[in-house]
Design a protein with these regions (language model features):
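N-terminal lobe/hinge region of extracytoplasmic solute-binding protein
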Residues: 37-87, 126, 195
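Alpha-helical secondary-structure segments
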Residues: 117-122, 152-156, 198-199, 229-234, ...
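Surface-exposed binding/hinge segments that line
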Residues: 133-180, 201-206
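Ligand-site clamp/hinge motif
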Residues: 191, 219-272, 406-408
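Structural transition elements
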Residues: 200, 337-370, 385-391
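Extracytoplasmic/peripheral linker and loop segments enriched in polar/acidic and small residues
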Residues: 315, 327-330, 406-417, 445-513, ...
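Ligand/substrate-recognition segments at binding pockets and active sites
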Residues: 335-336, 368-435, 508
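Long beta-strand-rich cores associated with HINT superfamily self-processing modules
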Residues: 510-535
Length: 535
């Protein structure tokens, strides 16, 4: 006979203690609470400090901006219902939606609220641009000449020079609307007491223990059937400090979702073709898709005496690496072999740039020519990386042995790697680029000669007059089809000149419990919970 616990049936009505001055408990159906762990902790819930995913995810639940991205990275209205861009690309005029309200808060009076207006964006932009506040997102304001609320409904931004990707830039959470009343009330504690317009409102945050968000009952968005969003009643975030503990919580059904997994569990869950193993499919789900992150090896071209200054040598190295084999055996195909350009899948879904395919014969021919032209008998290079990518760089080391290159590996702390590549210290270095905003220009800026490190992201010190002219022309091209053609030409020039070795384009890997519905993935790895529910 099988006995069932008397506590197993009521679908686990859990009790969350909401601390509001005095302790009182509110019972919430467990199926209405979405639980996840943030192993990196959260530093602030103030949008102007949302520079990392750990901050961006909760901020995205609490705040809204002028525009937002859908899962295919198309610009959609958020608090702005419409906008007009001037013909010269310098002026953006936004019309703000009516009757959108901030979360109820004592900062507006006793448990009160007020509607968002254009003045809130003027105030929020000033905060982002205030050097005394030290926002890591202040760089996004460098091309902004002025911004002003013309009235309660119209907000105008004027740029110093045209920038066709500006709407994508505005989708970042830095540009969220915050109420001046709340900032004045909480001062520098606003980041721990956030007030926004988002689908969830702040309830409680015990640092290193738990963050609780509750449903915003006056949220303005509805689903396709006219039902109010969000569906969930609460979000509960824990802060276990390592991915292994996080995975164990997930395995015990104590959290609903994990973003990627610790490498030690990779082979247990993921097959060699990158899919969830059949034996786990009855208990959990895997949602995956392209991630705007390109992993690569950079060549420092600032030293003309260096061997890697030879384009022929760089091409040979690129042809000598079997990226598909690397992805299959080292990463279980979690990601996509970078056999095309530098711009990753997600922005370049057509995959139309012809990149490097494994061609050992061609690589050997190029090396033979390089040795003859430079009177070289032996080629010795040094590749610098941090320890997290040791398996990748050792694979490259073995591949280059096949073309008679002696590659030494220099492992340094991540901080030393960042500093060294900025200062031109390493002839070859492992790096990655995650998009700040969803535009190919963000990747291609790494090869613009006016962006030389340490003052910009051009760590390779690649310089090319044709490239610079094409890159500058993208700023003014408002036609997205024509702009994509320019991006393709630029990406092709990167491959042709090979200042880098594209390794792979990353992939978002989201694991959920079987009863989680409505969670999607997107190339910027944003967490959108307003349409999520649990069966």
């Amino acid at each position: 006979m099988i006995y069932k616990s008397k506590f197993s049936i009521p679908f686990l009505i859990i009790t969350i203690l909401i601390i509001t001055g005095c302790s009182n408990s509110v019972s919430i159906d467990e199926k209405k609470v979405f639980r996840y762990n943030e192993h990196s902790n959260i530093s602030s819930l103030d949008p102007i400090y949302s520079s990392t995913l750990r901050n961006i995810w909760p901020v995205n639940q609490i705040f809204n901006g002028l525009v937002q991205l859908d899962d295919s990275l198309k610009i959609k209205p958020d608090l702005a219902k419409s906008w007009i861009i001037s013909k010269n690309g310098l002026e953006y005029k936004f019309v703000i939606k009516n009757k959108i309200f901030f979360h109820y808060s004592k900062t507006f009076g006793k448990d009160s609220t007020r509607a968002v207006n254009a003045g809130d964006f003027e105030y929020s932009f000033k905060r982002l641009n205030d050097p005394q506040l030290g926002s890591p997102g202040s760089w996004a304001m460098k091309n902004v000449n002025s911004f002003k609320a013309e009235n309660d409904s119209v907000f105008v931004i004027k740029l110093k020079k045209p920038f066709a990707a500006f709407l994508g830039l505005l989708s970042m959470k830095y540009f969220s609307a915050v109420p001046y009343e709340a900032v004045n009330f909480y001062g520098d504690k606003f980041g721990k007491n956030p007030i926004g317009t988002g689908p969830f409102k702040f309830k409680r945050w015990e640092e290193n223990i738990k963050l609780v968000l509750r449903k915003n009952n006056i949220y303005f968005e509805k689903d396709n059937l006219g039902k109010n969003l969000p569906y969930l009643e609460a979000i509960s975030v824990t802060f276990l400090p390592d991915k292994k503990s996080e995975f164990m919580e997930f395995a015990q059904n104590k959290i609903d979702f994990i973003n990627s997994i610790d490498s030690s569990f990779k082979d247990k869950l993921i097959s060699i073709d990158g899919n969830l193993k059949e034996e786990h499919s009855k208990k959990i789900k895997l949602i995956s898709g392209p991630y705007l992150n390109t992993e690569y090896i950079g060549f420092y071209l600032g030293d003309k005496k260096s061997q890697v200054h030879s384009k022929k040598l760089r091409l040979a190295i690129n042809y000598a690496i079997d990226r598909k084999k690397m992805m299959k055996y080292l990463r279980n195909n979690i990601g996509y072999a970078a056999n095309n350009g530098f711009v990753p899948l997600g922005l370049n879904m057509e995959n139309s740039v012809n990149g490097f395919r494994y061609n050992l014969k061609k690589a050997k021919t190029l090396i033979k020519e390089y040795k003859a032209e430079n009177n070289k008998e032996k080629i010795e290079l040094v590749l610098t990386s941090d320890a997290n990518y040791l398996d990748i760089v050792e694979f490259i080391q073995r591949e280059l042995q096949k073309i008679d290159i002696d590659l030494s590996i220099n492992i340094v702390p991540a901080s030393a790697l960042r500093q060294g590549k900025s200062n031109g210290k390493f002839e070859m270095f492992r790096a990655s680029w995650i998009a700040d905003y969803p535009e190919s220009e963000n990747y291609l800026s790494l090869f613009y000669s006016k962006n030389l490190a340490p003052n910009g992201p051009n760590y390779t010190h690649f310089k090319n007059v044709e490239y610079d002219m094409l890159f500058e022309s993208t700023y003014q091209e408002q036609n997205s089809v024509l702009r994509k053609r320019l991006y393709k030409k630029l990406d092709s020039l990167v491959i042709e000149n090979s200042p880098i070795i594209p390794l792979y384009y990353d992939k978002v890997m989201r694991f959920t419990q079987k009863n989680v519905e409505g969670l999607t993935t997107n190339p910027v790895n944003q967490l959108n919970l307003k349409k999520v529910y649990k069966k």
